[in-house]
Amino acid sequence: MTVDSKPQLQRLAADADVDRMCRLLEEDGAFILKGLLPFDVVESFNRELDVQMAIPPPKGERLLADKYPPHFKYVPNVATTCPTFRNTVLINPVIHAICEAYFQRTGDYWLSAAFLREIESGMPAQPFHRDDATHPLMHYQPLEAPPVSLSVIFPLTEFTEENGATEVILGSHRWTEVGTPERDQAVLATMDPGDVLIVRQRVVHAGGGNRTTAGKPRRVVLAYFNSVQLTPFETYRTMPREMVESMTVLGQRMLGWRTMKPSDPNIVGINLIDDKRLENVLQLKAADSPA
């Protein structure tokens, strides 16, 4: 029996020191938080996603879903369709403690996208990549530039080697190019439902292939937080106002319903209406600030 001598993903308790988490992002590029989401939250989230999975796909072109193979199921916009996500997962205080430290050099941040992927048996592994395809400008940032994107991966079923746990190449955020890595350069992010994988911008990674024969899919929700200097991949401006006003101020900020503030020298913010704050012009209420 041989022991893998490669450095492995660090696994931290959800109440670990945030400074340590941020150091790991800079040193390794990724880490796992154990048990961040309680069982009842995972269970509720899965029930809501089951409902969305059962809805027939809408007619007409689907810009992303139509590009995926049949072993790969995709549900967009979980912030609108899943109350558990927008009212609990999206405003998790640990996630935001990490984001506030991570984005401190670029200012406010918001949700760029959150969607479900369900990977069924027979789905091959992804090629290694960075999460910069939606905003190609990120590809041209120098290594010393502050990060403007953070990937947060929520497993909602068990992640194992056999069913395609995410493969992460530690330290690859310091590479100038992705190149053609070998799979043995990566480490596996095996996880339980409720764990969370946090991945720094530029880290090279891939979803593994699902080699199971029992027909059990691997279910994951991917959430991407970006600096407010980047336009979100998904827009949430079509959400019913009643739904928006049932959310907290933080949740509304994450979905682009409030004026946000980049770093200096911007002194007024972005997402303005007629030189005024968006929420003031809309007279927007919130669950934790009804007035």
UniProtKB/Swiss-Prot annotation:
EC numbers on record: 1.14.11.38
Q: GO biological process annotations for this chain's record?
A: verruculogen biosynthetic process
> What GO molecular function terms would the record report?
dioxygenase activity
Cofactor(s) required for function per UniProt: Fe cation
Q: Which InterPro entries match?
A: Phytyl_CoA_dOase-like
Give the positions the UniProt entry annotates as the active site: 68
Q: Subunit info?
A: Homodimer.
Q: What does this protein do?
A: Verruculogen synthase; part of the gene cluster that mediates the biosynthesis of fumitremorgins, indole alkaloids that carry not only intriguing chemical structures, but also interesting biological and pharmacological activities. The biosynthesis of fumitremorgin-type alkaloids begins by condensation of the two amino acids L-tryptophan and L-proline to brevianamide F, catalyzed by the non-ribosomal peptide synthetase ftmA. Brevianamide F is then prenylated by the prenyltransferase ftmPT1/ftmB in the presence of dimethylallyl diphosphate, resulting in the formation of tryprostatin B.
Q: What is this protein called?
A: Verruculogen synthase
Q: What organism does this protein naturally occur in?
A: Aspergillus fumigatus (strain ATCC MYA-4609 / CBS 101355 / FGSC A1100 / Af293) (Neosartorya fumigata)
Q: What is the lineage of its organism?
A: Eukaryota, Fungi, Dikarya, Ascomycota, Pezizomycotina
